């Protein structure tokens, strides 16, 4: 868009006449009607009115917001012709415009060519913020140092421009230094500055420092609460999110969509369906459904808490569905082993003219894999490049290897890997290793393991997986070899844990842990269930029973299920969330227990959802 082709400088009378234009320009800028603001500016020039130092900041803001560098450069000429280049607010607007258009060198030139700039904190602040927005860490730090050396006062705006640079761990040292300078300079009473430091600490993983700063604040507004809640969520501290959310409500602060996205994500992580349902009702009653981010988080929460019907209901009533919404819903069906419905939704998306991206295809291929739709998955993989002109990435190749591997077509999976146009990465070899575990192919597993640890030598999961493959084949030498490798690397096996919700409280069970308040009752219930399972099996596999008793009887999902049976009404469904893949022994155990107690158990593990009912599992032993 071109602002104007010529600029005529008129008399003082014309400048006075510009005042009503300035009022309207300001209104349009405040309403974010930037295109209309530029059109009005052109009309202003055609009418013979001359812009002044009050006009330029608004129109420059419009050019910056629309990222119109050519129009911005033309305006710069108008500023010079109008003699306004020394006005502080015009200078600041020019610097900001160039920075927002990505022309940081031009912004720096404006700063350096105007001697007045080096005496004004607003000009320094504009340039520092611009460098930060363009990830120019060294330049921003240099300008800050220069600002202090020349005696220009550092204010809260300066800090708000600098702190976002320090939201990655490698620059946390700089952030701590800035925090110290804030305290020394008396800026630590500024709420906006403190909020930015809380966000910085949280994003850098320094959660305790962020929480300490939060606790020290005498007055906490919505933005402050959100900074800590979202920080906990980003660091995987779902328990803390829900606890702080309750404190926030008790303090009288009402949540907004940003709060709810973090809370819904935490409910999804923990499987806290009761709390999630309450938050879902709040979303509906407060009119947040049109917010696509909240609705997407609601879809994920309901689906990951086992309520796929409600997830679909939220999806269906969304007035506007983003590509992320479609991707999430398709992924939900895949996670629940309902790949056929996921593919129907994908077809519906295509018919509506929505173009898929790589992320959608990851979900579609994964859905095919978990539902045994091997040929359909192969067809879609070919269509990805042929029909949609999308180049497959490593994640798509690993999905296809998983697809073939789960179906037992291991030789085809290996041929596919060997024919890949790019070098297979760890995810590809890891998918093959997982398939070898399912189909007990030790020779191919050894090859896949050797390859995968070249890419991910510190991923303990692959060592555990290979050890289990050796265990299944009774290869004691192989087991010891893996243990030696793990010992040499000082690995510790990731502990398994499971969540189960009861009366709005989420209970955590660790494998082998006896710290829960009902541990004695839980273990008595577990003993009774194991006795019933042995009776049901007719002691047909006594040796296996002894092995299971000694190695897996205290796996976390068993403890969680026993707790759920103890604390719920007979016949009700029990939802358990596990961080690792359910082992084969526990999978068999849960199928048998579901028949004995006549219950449905819904278990979400690291792989998918399992619905145990009447002695069978929805995954058809295919996970």
From Swiss-Prot:
Q: Where in the cell is it found?
A: Mitochondrion
Q: What does this protein do?
A: Involved in C-to-U editing of mitochondrial RNA. Required specifically for editing the mitochondrial NAD2 transcript.
Q: Where is this region: Type E motif?
A: 428-503
Region annotated Type DYW motif, chain positions: 536-623
Q: Which organism is it from?
A: Arabidopsis thaliana (Mouse-ear cress)
Entry protein name: Putative pentatricopeptide repeat-containing protein At3g11460, mitochondrial
Q: Which UniProt keywords apply?
A: Mitochondrion, mRNA processing, Repeat, Transit peptide
- What does the entry give for GO biological process? cytidine to uridine editing; mRNA processing
Membrane spanning segments where? none
């Amino acid at each position: 868009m071109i602002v104007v082709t010529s600029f005529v400088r008129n008399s003082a009378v014309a400048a006075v006449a510009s005042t009503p234009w300035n009022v309207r320009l300001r209104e349009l800028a405040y309403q974010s009607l930037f295109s209309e603001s530029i059109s009005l500016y052109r009309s202003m020039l055609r009418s013979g009115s001359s812009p002044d130092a009050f006009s330029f900041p608004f129109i420059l803001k419009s050019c910056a917001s629309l990222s119109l560098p050519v129009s911005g450069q033309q305006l710069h000429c108008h500023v010079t012709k109008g003699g306004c280049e020394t006005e502080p607010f015009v200078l600041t607007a020019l610097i900001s415009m160039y920075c927002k258009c990505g022309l940081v060198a031009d912004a720096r030139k404006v700063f350096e060519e105007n001697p007045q700039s080096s005496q004004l904190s607003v000009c320094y602040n504009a340039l520092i913020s611009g460098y930060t927005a363009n990830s120019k860490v060294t330049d921003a730090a240099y300008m800050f140092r220069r600002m202090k050396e020349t005696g220009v006062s550092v204010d809260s705006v300066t800090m708000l421009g600098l702190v976002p640079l320090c939201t990655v761990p490698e620059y946390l040292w700089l952030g701590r230094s800035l925090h110290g300078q804030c305290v020394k300079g008396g800026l630590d009473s500024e709420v906006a500055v403190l909020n930015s430091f809380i966000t910085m600490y949280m994003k850098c993983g320094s959660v305790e420092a962020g929480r300490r700063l939060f606790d020290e604040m005498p007055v906490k507004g919505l933005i402050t609460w959100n900074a800590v809640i979202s920080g906990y969520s980003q660091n995987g501290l779902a328990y803390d999110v829900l606890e702080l959310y309750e404190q926030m409500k008790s303090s009288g602060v009402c949540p907004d969509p940003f709060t709810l996205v973090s809370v819904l994500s935490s409910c999804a992580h923990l499987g806290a369906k009761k709390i999630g349902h309450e938050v879902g009702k709040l979303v509906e009653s407060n009119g947040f459904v049109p917010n696509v981010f909240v609705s997407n988080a609601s879809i994920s929460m309901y689906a990951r808490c086992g309520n796929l019907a409600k997830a679909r209901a939220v999806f269906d009533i969304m007035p506007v569905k983003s590509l992320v919404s479609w991707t999430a819903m398709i992924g939900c069906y895949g996670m629940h082993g309902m790949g056929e419905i996921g593919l129907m939704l994908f077809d519906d998306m295509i018919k509506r003219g929505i173009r898929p991206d790589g992320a959608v295809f990851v979900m579609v291929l994964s859905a095919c894999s978990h539902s045994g739709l091997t040929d359909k998955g192969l067809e879609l993989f070919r269509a990805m490049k042929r029909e949609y002109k999308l180049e497959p990435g490593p994640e798509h190749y690993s999905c296809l290897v998983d697809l073939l591997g789960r179906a037992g077509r291991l030789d085809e999976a290996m041929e596919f890997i060997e024919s890949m146009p790019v070098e297979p990465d760890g995810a590809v070899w890891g998918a093959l290793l997982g398939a070898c575990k399912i189909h007990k192919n030790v020779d191919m597993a050894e090859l896949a393991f050797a390859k995968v640890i070249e890419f991910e030598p510190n991923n303990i999961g692959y060592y555990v997986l290979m050890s289990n493959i050796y265990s299944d084949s009774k290869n004691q030498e192989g087991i010891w070899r893996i243990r030696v490798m793990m010992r040499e690397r000082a690995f510790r096996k990731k502990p398994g844990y499971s969540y189960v919700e009861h009366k709005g409280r989420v209970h955590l069970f660790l494998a082998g842990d006896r710290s829960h308040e009902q541990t004695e009752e839980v273990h008595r219930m577990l003993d009774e269930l194991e006795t019933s399972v042995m009776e049901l099996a007719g002691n047909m596999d006594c040796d296996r029973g002894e092995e299971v008793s000694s190695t897996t009887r205290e796996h976390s999902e068993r403890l969680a299920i026993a707790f759920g049976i103890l604390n719920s009404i007979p016949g009700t469904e029990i939802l358990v969330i596990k961080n690792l893949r359910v082992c084969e022994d526990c999978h068999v155990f849960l199928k048998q227990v579901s028949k004995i107690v006549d219950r449905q158990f819904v278990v979400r593990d690291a792989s998918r959802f399992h619905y145990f009912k009447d002695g069978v599992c929805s995954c058809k032993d295919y996970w």
